[in-house]
């Protein structure tokens, strides 16, 4: 018995993951499956760990100032967005000034 998985990256590159489910000295098929699932989990963690590291390096290389900012949004957009209504269907959340 074995577990198979396939990861397709953003560029369309395929990577197959294959893990045998035979643990040495284990005769129970469920224990063997559990061992295989644990191994698959480790493979997936390694795969995504390397993907995350590569993406982080790409971001720093592409735009070091933006990567250090920690804000993925456009800063000029924040400055121009002064109307922060949450409910456009209802009345304004601001208190109306009464004439004195």
UniProtKB/Swiss-Prot annotation:
Residues 50-100 are annotated as: Disordered. Residues 66-81 have a biased composition (Acidic residues). One of its GO terms (biological process) is tRNA threonylcarbamoyladenosine modification. The keyword Phosphoprotein does not apply. It comes from the Eukaryota. It is found in: Nucleus. Coiled coil: none annotated. Signal peptide: none annotated. The modification N-acetylmethionine is found at residue 1. Component of the EKC/KEOPS complex that is required for the formation of a threonylcarbamoyl group on adenosine at position 37 (t(6)A37) in tRNAs that read codons beginning with adenine. The complex is probably involved in the transfer of the threonylcarbamoyl moiety of threonylcarbamoyl-AMP (TC-AMP) to the N6 group of A37. GON7 plays a supporting role to the catalytic subunit OSGEP in the complex. Component of the EKC/KEOPS complex composed of at least GON7, TP53RK, TPRKB, OSGEP and LAGE3; the whole complex dimerizes. This is EKC/KEOPS complex subunit GON7. The gene is GON7.
